[in-house]
């Protein structure tokens, strides 16, 4: 769920939610601010499950309509940029008219009201920022995959200070991989980098 060269860690809960989506759903929506690993999570989960994936930005939603036979899963990023009712209706029609297709929607904002009818039918599943915060086990797995050796108790401090925010953990791992010890100066530098992200 995090971009650090090949270091990716995914919470088991997120994997289970995607499994349920593939078994019972048609729409999966991930809504969280930047830095929660929405795109990384979707790329990682879908690459193992599907061959025909079309990824588009919301401002190119009409591209998904051109040839639905060429994709099994349509990934629409930046859903928060859809501002016209015409684009909203276009996406809703695409979902309704293609019952054998899956749709993965990513947004930095709240779930738009115009997709709520799909939620009420039970066809839509979601992952929020709260779902994407790393727990201790996922964070440890991430640091291990990042080849960052943590001293006793360091993970506790990192989790306390970062709250498990994926971007913060990525920045901490990048600095620690360079040999910087975890502490207030690294935390301050990381906070500045997050602010500038």
Task: Tell where the protein language model's regions lie, with residue ranges.
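N-terminal pre-P-loop "Q-motif" helix
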Residues: 4-18
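Phosphate-binding P-loop
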Residues: 19-25
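Walker A/P-loop nucleotide-binding motif
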Residues: 25-42
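Amphipathic alpha-helical "lid/sensor" segments that cap RecA-like P-loop NTPase cores
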Residues: 35, 42, 126, 144-197
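Conserved catalytic segments around the Walker B and adjacent sensor/switch elements
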Residues: 47-62
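Conserved P-loop NTPase "ATPase switch" module shared by AAA+ and STAND
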Residues: 67-87, 106
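Sensor-1/coupling segment of RecA-like P-loop NTPase cores
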Residues: 81-83, 93-121
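The catalytic "switch" region of P-loop NTPases
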Residues: 100, 112-149
